[in-house]
From Swiss-Prot:
Keyword presence, Protein biosynthesis: no
Protein name (record): UNC93-like protein C922.05c
Source organism (scientific name): Schizosaccharomyces pombe (strain 972 / ATCC 24843)
Bilayer topology: Multi-pass membrane protein
Keywords: Cytoplasm, Membrane, Transmembrane, Transmembrane helix
C-alpha cells in the first residue's frame, strides 16, 4: 500500500467517526492513530509566503519552545549572575544565596527526572521556571531593605524549581531528535538559551556605559523579573510528548509513569543495572565548577561594572559559537558515532589544557589580597591590555559550551528513551549543582584565587579521564531500545519520511 493510498484511507476512516481506530501499515500491522478532528491542526505546516512553517507538533518546534523558556528564565538568570555577585558590589550575599540554591538543586535534582516522568514535561517545565523571578525579586528587595533572609529563601526556592526545569529540558533536547541530529538540537537549544544571556547582558551594559555606579539599577532587575515570569508561562503552550512527532514521522516514545514508588525504584535500578554511569559523575560534577571563578574571581574582581557587562556579553555570545562548533563536529556524518565520541574526547581535553594554560598567565597577575587593597584599580575596557583579557574570557565561554554540549551528546547517545534520559539529566544537573554549591561556599570563605583556579583545571581534565571507559565502551554506532521499535504513524504523516502536513 502506498503512502498516498494510506492518506486517502485515513481520511475516509475518520470522516464519519472520531474514535481512535487501528490502521494498517506496510511493515508493522496495526498501530493506534489519533482522530483528525482532535489532532490534525498541530501537524499542519502553513505557508508564509514561499515558505512552509514548522508543524506546531513537530519535535523541532517543541525543542524551540523549550529553548525560549530557557532563554527567558535561566538565560536571564545567567546574564545577571555573569555580572558577579548578582549585579551587586559585594558578592557575599549572592554567594550565600547560591549556596542555598545549588544545595537544594543538588538534593532535588537527583530525583527531578522521576518527578518529570510523574507529572509530565510541560507542567515540570512551567513549575521549574517560577523560581527565577522569585530569586531576582529577592535581589531587588535586598538592594533597598537588606533582607538577607528573603535572598536565601529565593535561592532555596529556585534550587527546588530549577532542578525540575532542567530535568524536563534535558529529556526533550536529548530524546526528541533523531540520533544523527542530536548535536544539532543541542546547538539550537544552546544558541537560543544563551541568546537570552546575550540580550540580558546588553541591558546593564547600556545602563552602565556612562555610569560610575558599580551595581545594576532597579530597572534592570524589574525587566528580568517580568521576562522570567513570561518564560514560565510559555511552557504551558507545549504539546505533550506523546503527541509530538519526530522528523521521521514517529511519535516521541514515552512510557506512562506508574507512580512515586516505582519511579524511585526505577532510579535505584538505573544505578544498579547501569553502574558504569557512575564514571560520568565526575564530569557532571565539574561541568559548573569553574563558573564561580569566572564570574566572581575573574570578572567581578578585576573589572568595573561597565566592563563586566561587556565581558558578560562576550562570554555568552561565545557560548553560542562554541555550541555551534561542537554540533558541526558531533553530527558530522562522515565519521560514525563511535569515532566522533572518541575524537571529541581528545579535542575537548586539548582545549581545556590550552585555554586554562592561558588563564594561568592572567591569574598570576593578581591575588585575592591584592584586589582588596585600597590602591587596587579595577580595569576598564579602555585600559591598555584589555583586549587580551577579553579574548581569554571569550575562550572560557566557548569552552564551557563545548564541554557541556559534549556531555549532553554523550548522555543522549546512551539512550533514546525520554523517561530514562530524564533520569540521566536529573543526575547531571544534581551533581553539577552540588559542585556549584561547593564553589560558591569556597568563594565566600575567601580561598586563594590560585587554589580555586588549579582545582578547576584539574577537575575538568580528571573528569574526562574518568569518563573515558564509558566513552570508549558504551557509545555504539546506534542506540537500540524500545523507542526504535515503535511503529511509524499512520494518521496522515509520512510512514517512512519527514513530517508531512495533513492539510495545506
Amino acid at each position: 500500500m502506498s503512502s498516498d493510498n494510506l492518506d486517502i484511507s485515513m481520511e475516509k476512516k475518520y470522516s464519519a467517526d472520531v474514535d481512535v481506530e487501528k490502521a494498517p501499515t506496510p511493515e508493522y500491522g496495526e498501530v493506534e492513530t489519533a482522530p483528525l478532528s482532535q489532532s490534525s491542526w498541530i501537524y499542519r505546516r502553513p505557508r508564509i509566503g514561499r515558505f512552509k512553517s514548522l508543524a506546531y507538533g513537530s519535535a523541532l518546534t517543541q525543542t524551540i519552545i523549550v529553548s525560549w523558556v530557557c532563554f527567558l528564565c535561566p538565560g536571564m538568570f545567567n546574564a545577571l549572575s555573569g555580572l558577579g555577585g548578582g549585579g551587586e558590589v559585594n558578592a557575599d550575599v549572592a554567594n550565600d544565596a547560591n549556596v542555598a540554591l545549588y544545595s537544594t538543586f543538588a538534593g532535588l535534582g537527583f530525583f527531578a527526572g522521576s518527578i518529570c516522568n510523574l507529572i509530565g514535561v510541560k507542567l515540570t517545565l512551567a513549575i521549574g521556571g517560577t523560581g527565577y523571578s522569585v530569586y531576582t525579586a529577592s535581589l531587588l528587595c535586598y538592594k533597598h531593605v537588606y533582607n538577607r533572609g528573603f535572598v536565601i529563601f529565593g535561592g532555596c526556592y529556585l534550587g527546588l524549581t530549577a532542578g525540575m526545569l532542567w530535568a524536563a529540558q534535558g529529556a526533550v533536547i536529548m530524546s526528541y531528535p533523531r540520533e544523527e541530529n542530536k548535536a544539532r538540537y543541542i546547538a539550537i537549544f544552546w544558541g537560543i538559551f544563551n541568546l537570552g544571556a546575550v540580550i540580558g547582558s546588553i541591558v546593564p551594559l547600556a545602563q552602565t556605559m556612562h555610569s560610575s555606579v558599580n551595581s545594576v539599577g532597579d530597572g534592570t532587575y524589574a525587566g528580568f523579573i517580568v521576562l522570567m515570569a513570561v518564560g514560565s508561562a510559555l511552557a504551558l503552550f507545549m504539546v505533550s510528548p506523546e503527541k509530538t512527532v519526530k522528523e521521521d514521522g514517529k511519535f516521541v516514545h514515552i512510557e506512562k509513569s506508574m507512580g512515586w514508588k516505582k519511579e524511585l525504584l526505577g532510579l535505584v535500578q538505573t544505578l544498579y543495572k547501569e553502574y558504569w554511569v557512575l564514571l560520568l559523575f565526575p564530569m557532571f560534577f565539574s561541568s559548573n565548577w569553574f563558573t564561580t571563578y569566572q564570574f566572581n574571581d575573574f570578572n567581578l574582581a578585576y573589572f568595573n561594572i561597565r566592563t563586566r557587562s561587556l565581558n558578560n556579553l562576550l562570554y555568552w555570545f561565545a557560548q553560542i559559537m562554541g555550541s555551534a562548533v561542537a554540533a558541526l563536529f558531533l553530527d558530522w556524518q562522515r565519521f560514525n558515532r563511535v569515532i566522533r565520541a572518541r575524537v571529541g574526547w581528545g579535542l575537548v581535553f586539548v582545549l581545556i589544557c590550552v585555554i586554562w594554560g592561558g588563564g594561568l598567565a592572567f591569574q598570576l597577575k593578581y591575588t585575592r589580597k591584592s584586589v582588596a587593597e585600597s590602591d587596587f584599580v579595577v580595569t576598564d575596557f579602555t585600559h591598555r591590555g584589555y583586549t587580551g583579557y577579553a579574548f581569554l574570557y571569550i575562550f572560557y565561554g566557548m569552552l564551557d559550551a563545548i564541554f557541556q554540549s559534549y556531555a549532553y551528546w554523550i548522555i543522549g547517545s546512551l539512550s533514546n528513551d525520554t523517561n530514562k534520559l530524564a533520569v540521566y539529566m536529573g543526575f547531571y544537573k544534581s551533581l553539577q549543582s552540588a559542585g556549584a554549591a561547593i564553589t560558591y561556599r569556597m568563594d565566600t570563605l575567601n580561598i586563594p584565587y590560585m587554589n580555586y583556579f588549579a582545582s578547576c583545571w584539574a577537575l575538568l581534565c580528571g573528569s574526562l579521564i574518568v569518563a573515558s571507559p564509558v566513552i570508549w565502551k558504551k557509545i555504539k554506532l546506534t542506540t537500540e531500545g524500545i523507542e526504535d521499535e515503535i511503529p511509524p504513524l499512520a494518521n496522515g504523516l509520512a510512514v517512512d519520511g519527514p513530517v508531512v502536513p495533513l492539510k495545506e
